């Protein structure tokens, strides 16, 4: 999966994005947001 840029600039931005869009946990790697199922 491709990381989403711009979601890791704010604390919790990636987590909120992933939860709202896919219902998954968010992980920031290399300044990009990745959504992972748990």
Curated annotation (Swiss-Prot):
GO MF, one annotated term: toxin activity
UniProt-listed SUPFAM superfamilies: Scorpion toxin-like
Annotated keywords: Disulfide bond, Ion channel impairing toxin, Neurotoxin, Potassium channel impairing toxin, Secreted, Toxin
Misc. remarks from the entry: Negative results: no activity on the mammalian voltage-gated potassium channels Kv1.1/KCNA1, Kv1.2/KCNA2, Kv1.3/KCNA3, Kv1.4/KCNA4, Kv1.5/KCNA5 and Kv1.6/KCNA6. Is not toxic to mice when intracerebroventricular injected (when tested up to 37 ng/20 g).
Cellular component, GO, one term: extracellular region
Entry note about domains: Has the structural arrangement of an alpha-helix connected to antiparallel beta-sheets by disulfide bonds (CS-alpha/beta).
Expression tissues: Expressed by the venom gland.
Main location: secreted
Function field: A probable toxin that has no activity on the tested mammalian voltage-gated potassium channels (when tested at 1 uM) and is not toxic to mice. It resembles alpha toxins that block voltage-gated potassium channels.
Disulphide bridges: 8-28, 14-33, 18-35
Segment forming the signal sequence: none
Localization in the cell: Secreted
Protein name, as recorded: Toxin Bot33
Organism superkingdom: Eukaryota
Annotated source species: Buthus occitanus tunetanus
Family in the record: Belongs to the short scorpion toxin superfamily. Potassium channel inhibitor family.
């Amino acid at each position: 999966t491709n990381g989403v840029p711009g979601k890791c600039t704010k604390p919790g931005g990636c987590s909120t994005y992933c939860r709202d869009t896919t219902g998954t946990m968010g992980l920031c790697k290399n300044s990009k947001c990745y959504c992972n199922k748990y």
